[in-house]
Amino acid sequence: MIIEGPVIKFGDKIDTDIIIPARYLKYTDPQYLAQHAMEPLDPEFYKKASKGVIIVAGKVFGMGSSREQAAIALKAAGVKAVVAESFARIFYRNAINNGLPVITLPNSTKEIDESSYVKIDVETGEILVGNKVLKGKGITGMALEILQAGGIMEYLKKMQTVNRN
């Protein structure tokens, strides 16, 4: 699974309240949530991300309260993947379960510039930035299968169909 796109860069400790502010949690429409993704840091994020971007961030991306809407909002906004030094465990699983690839890369914010265009091999974790290949932590096994299906619901539908035949 190869993903590529331009980078939008954030720092450390981007919590779920920044990814999607609590006042929007009562809404379920992914496109509405997308319009408010990252709003506290960048009110224009939705417009920038709509062309398909890769977020590069620092440590503990997705920390804070558990809210599935964070991954949903990012994906619906046009985020193709998130590369970070580390992720909050619950955000990481929510992202996978919603079909949003998340790649752990030590020193990600030092290795990748805001103006970069990156190409990511999700399975191996290799990230091509210009002429440089960076080695992140790839996604394998069932997590990769869930991503390839488009998320946990699509994966379960696929497995149900396979088991019927």
From Swiss-Prot:
This is 3-isopropylmalate dehydratase small subunit. The keyword Lyase applies. Belongs to the LeuD family. LeuD type 2 subfamily. It holds the Pfam family Aconitase_C. Pathway: Amino-acid biosynthesis; L-leucine biosynthesis; L-leucine from 3-methyl-2-oxobutanoate: step 2/4. GO terms for biological process: L-leucine biosynthetic process. It catalyses: (2R,3S)-3-isopropylmalate = (2S)-2-isopropylmalate. It comes from the Archaea. Its EC number is 4.2.1.33. Catalyzes the isomerization between 2-isopropylmalate and 3-isopropylmalate, via the formation of 2-isopropylmaleate. Heterodimer of LeuC and LeuD. HAMAP family: LeuD_type2 (MF_01032). It comes from Saccharolobus islandicus (strain M.16.27). GO terms for molecular function: 3-isopropylmalate dehydratase activity. CDD domains: IPMI_Swivel. Keywords: Amino-acid biosynthesis, Branched-chain amino acid biosynthesis, Leucine biosynthesis, Lyase.
